């Protein structure tokens, strides 16, 4: 005890000498935070796949990008693996998750607009074969821990019906980290933590980052390394609300900005969670035949403590700060390690890449927009991807200065869209707030937040950048290169011809948690689904003679909420 004199428990935690995972009996056995690497041997096939997804982590919010936030585990794993420095995701939650699990752009799943909200009768289309389903076909055990956010209005939409053997996590977009409550408007609140298809009331009170890491470790402890495993860990961190255990806040006590301080503490806690999962992989015999993929889901929300510096924009925008992702691959199976890859990679690419690693196959009939990029990542070959459709959102067409004439008669530039072809990036419509927010503006709150470098022109609806030469999007070349603008507008039009209609239904009052025992969960039946389909068809064409819509109070409420969605909810993320 004398050796510890002058030190407090908090100071030990702040220095990283204690770990909440293996410090608790029965979760992970006592031992060092990093186990020794196991002797190399010819790995069996196929490999174990661990996909770790973080929520709202900014491009600048990792140590190896020069952040003031401590992420020693992520820094080490990235340094020993392959850093993906030309990696793209989507600007908000649902689209990134849908593209990860389907390998398809939003325009091919009907999820082009916004996110799936708790009261919407909507989910990842049931006709889509998901990544975990393909891995199950290849003989994998599949497990998910964390945030789903792909819809749940019917039981068929739940993770355990979409390819996962087990699930522990939340179904909605953001919950309290301790109580797991989530509100979708004033007075519309419910509990959202689920174990399989049941509400996990008994787990309330445990900080979600720790709970999810502990569950991941339990899965590894109870699973045989001889059977291939797919473990998808979708942390809630570091999405709002900004909540962190006190011991992590203490580490950043000198940060002047309260939001940044809480955010930094959450990132470091998440980093330690990744450390504990990695340690469990080594302890239970998975590591030598494993592939660990780390990815953010969208850009950081700068007004909630995140930073995307030196990139332009933030979460919810199509500037680089909204769509450039944090990503790396760590694996003993990599042929060329300890390097940075500039190969163009998009989140849709993980579907065919991981199916290929698993020994499965994909074909043109699958309609995938992703590519198998494993040779580019593992061996340093050229990426098969040369372009990315960031999105086309036909419902978001409010740019005042956009028009079909402004798009050379090829494209209505009022429509929000963004595309990358080779080194060129084109944006139309309203891409979102395009500020550059350097880290020094985060020193205090709220005054210095507004001391930003604002984008110079707002009276336009077309932007063109050479991303290879200008990754920070400072020099708009649209006026200088109308030939390139025409080419990319035509490419947008080509993509748009393959798009399916947007599915963004109005909120359904029956989804209220009060009708489901106080918890968010499935509420619709097959009859409800038929009625929804009937309403969708009715908006596109007149009903045939002799067929009449049901008259009901709920239908009138749906009409009201649909109008409300159009005016207000389309602007929220």
UniProtKB/Swiss-Prot annotation:
Cellular component terms per the entry's GO annotation: endoplasmic reticulum; extracellular region
Region (Disordered): 506-550
Residues listed as glycosylation sites in the UniProt record: 276, 288, 466, 496
Acidic residues bias spans: 525-537
EC top class, as a word: hydrolase
Residues annotated for substrate binding in this entry: 147, 239, 315
Its biological purpose: Displays arylsulfatase activity at neutral pH, when co-expressed with SUMF1; arylsulfatase activity is measured in the secretion medium of retinal cell line, but no activity is recorded when measured in cell extracts.
Compartmental location: Secreted; Endoplasmic reticulum
Active-site residues from the entry: 93 (nucleophile), 149
Residues given in the record as Ca(2+) binding sites: 55-56, 93, 297-298
Enzyme Commission number(s) of this protein: 3.1.6.-
Cofactor stoichiometry and binding remark: Binds 1 Ca(2+) ion per subunit.
Post-translational modification summary for this protein: The oxidation of Cys-93 residue to 3-oxoalanine (also known as C(alpha)-formylglycine) by SUMF1/Sulfatase-modifying factor 1, seems critical for catalytic activity.
Signal sequence annotation: 1-23
Annotated PROSITE patterns: SULFATASE_1, SULFATASE_2
Official protein name in the record: Arylsulfatase I
Keywords, alphabetical: Calcium, Endoplasmic reticulum, Glycoprotein, Hydrolase, Metal-binding, Secreted, Signal
Taxonomic superkingdom: Eukaryota
Residue numbers carrying 3-oxoalanine (Cys): 93
MF terms (GO), sorted A to Z: metal ion binding; sulfuric ester hydrolase activity
Keyword Signal (UniProt): yes
Co-factor requirement: Ca(2+)
Family: Belongs to the sulfatase family.
